[in-house]
Amino acid sequence: MNRFVGVLAVAIVGWFANATCAQSVDVATLVEQLRQGGYVIVMRHGGTNRDQADTDPLNPENVAKQRLLSESGRAVARDVGSAWRKLGIPVGVVYTSRFNRAVETGRLVGGVDVKSTDDVTEGGLVVTPIENDRRAEALRKLAATPPPAGKNTLIVTHKPNIIDAFGRDWFEIKEGEATVFKPDAAGKATSVGRLQAADWIKTSAAR
């Protein structure tokens, strides 16, 4: 088991550089870079109702049996989307989990139609360990895929997927928190910053 964990850690490091838990980031500078496109933003879905649970996790279409965005979570996601548009952050493709809280976050933040996929959908204990590993690998590949010129890719997923893909540094990732990756031509990506929802909103308000 220890050997397996070591191999997995090496594999993650091989995909990503500078992926640290407490990256200090100049938000204004990062926004200017995002305005040029070329980044992948991996976001945990927005704030949810804490008195709800996914009671039918095998059927993501069954929205009534899911933990959904709270009213405040929905409002914050909408404000983040407005901030992105005010800041001039161009969004190309938006990939989301099939669960409604991720789909809704993607639409509100990205402002475009979303592509829901099993690749970034939380599997938890209802899919096999092999399938969870496949989804982690798929998320890493998406984060390391350069977007179309002049655009940024948004991926809205879940805490377990993010931890599985990028490591334990993301154990405390909050709802609505985003990690910005810079893909390169070699098929790898560098984590260049982690931002809370409030960071986008405050930066936009200061303009």
Which residues are covered by each model-predicted region?
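Positively charged n-region of N-terminal signal peptides that target proteins for export
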Residues: 1-4
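Bacterial N-terminal signal peptides
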Residues: 7-16
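Sec/Tat signal peptide C-region and signal peptidase I cleavage site
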Residues: 18-22
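Active-site-proximal alpha-helix that buttresses catalytic centers in soluble enzyme cores
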Residues: 24-119, 123-127, 133-135, 169-198, ...
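Generic beta-sheet signal
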Residues: 38-40, 148-157
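Histidine-centered catalytic micro-motifs
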Residues: 43-48, 155-162
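Glycine-rich phosphate-binding loop signature in dinucleotide/nucleotide-binding domains
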Residues: 87-89, 146-150
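A short, acidic, amphipathic alpha-helical segment used as a generic capping/interface helix at domain edges
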Residues: 136-147
